[in-house]
Amino acid sequence: MRWNDRTRGLVLFALALLIYGFGIGRAFVFDDVVYISDNSLLHRPDAFRAFWFTSEAFNYYPLFWSLLRIQWLLWGNHPLGYHLVNLLVHCTNALLVWRIARLWRLPAAWWVAALFAVHPVNVQTLSWAAEQKNTWSFLFMALALFAFDKHTARRDWRSYAVAFVCFIAALACKTSTVCLPVFLAMRYAFTQRANARAILLKLMPFFAAAFAAGVTTMWFEQNRVGAKSLMSTLSLWQRIEASGAAFWFYLEKALLPVHLTPMYQGWVDSTASSHGLLPGLLLAIALVACALLSRHIG
């Protein structure tokens, strides 16, 4: 068999399909019931209007909810369709990771994508139909990243427009994608220092969209999801401390994926206080070290 790009892509797609396809016939679990089966808003004839123009949903992820609504119209309360869509989007994401890794000329780009495709931390997302917001948001974020890189390489303004639209779509699926403009700013500050200021100006609309999405999500989290009581127990300083600790916690899960669970103990007052400054300081040192290393290599 000739080992060309098409073959590599098919093998990568099939690998993700094989690893996560065995349990595709499973029932709804955890929030699937709340998000799909028992979600009266999802079943309403005016669901699309409600998702985009009201605050009735659990959170303001209008594109995610709209995609879920389309699936409800297609296969109703049957879990198979939702799990299949989630799996196919994940397989597509693996191909995008490969494409981006090649664009960045990373060594062993295909193996990087293969690791992403089969990594155990994806089990939660692929087992939980309601977690389509992860796979869809990653898809649009990866497309935005790819298009922005294309724009910076070719000065193609259509690619810039595509990148911005895809970023808005990613935010409309899950707000955790607000990190993209920060990542892009850091990436080009290290790799294209001469053009860093111009690129930062181009990223201003991305930062504005991320800020708006973040403020909206904070309101929904406090008034719809019920996070207000938890947030009220943490001071601003404790939240900063917890953020530094959370980075290392999830990095540990990525490097050593053991004792994984769909839900971890929240960052409550007592645990936030126990983190101290060390995790945040180590994170800052790591970022500075990466910047210096990039400058030295560049």
Segments predicted by a language model, with ranges:
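Polytopic membrane enzymes that build or remodel cell-surface glycoconjugates and lipids
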Residues: 1-298
